[in-house]
């Protein structure tokens, strides 16, 4: 005879999920059941095109890897990730970063390389904890002044003067 395990006995405390190179075309639903504990989510090298509204309920995230996908839009709900320390959205199809990214006050490392960006948001200097910014292979016209406390900026092969 089989018995269902009560929901309260299930392990809902998962801090890291690694779904890199899994040929995903959408964010798996099972990820959301760990919204209260998930701190690191790696979805790099898939075929994701969009991030659903529910995705931005993962408010405990500290590290988010979305590189090498086909994401076409970074929604303003990115502001929900106020504890995010590291963001990698390199090599996607993101044409602009929303102004609301300024709410990600804990952000220290950001990689926007390989996207069709021409500018960074006006609010970008509000990211005072930002120490590493990678913007390789994009067509930025200029970098905003006073961007965080940058220690390292990777701007190689850009079409802008350094």
Where are these regions (language model features)?
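The feature captures the LRR N-terminal capping module
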Residues: 1-162
């Amino acid at each position: 005879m089989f018995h269902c395990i009560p929901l309260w006995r299930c392990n809902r405390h998962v801090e890291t999920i690694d779904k890199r190179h899994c040929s995903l075309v959408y964010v798996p639903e099972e990820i959301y059941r760990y919204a209260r504990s998930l701190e690191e989510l790696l979805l790099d090298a898939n075929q994701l095109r969009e991030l659903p509204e529910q995705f931005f309920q993962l408010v405990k995230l500290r590290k988010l890897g979305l590189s090498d996908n086909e994401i076409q839009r970074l929604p303003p709900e990115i502001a929900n990730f106020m504890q995010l320390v590291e963001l990698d959205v390199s090599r996607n199809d993101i044409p602009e970063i929303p102004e609301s990214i300024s709410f990600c006050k804990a952000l220290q490392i950001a990689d926007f390389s390989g996207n069709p960006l021409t500018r960074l948001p006006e609010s970008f200097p509000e990211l005072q904890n930002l120490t590493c910014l990678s913007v390789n292979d994009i067509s930025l016209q200029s970098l905003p002044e006073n961007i965080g406390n940058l220690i390292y900026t990777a701007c190689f092969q850009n079409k802008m003067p350094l």
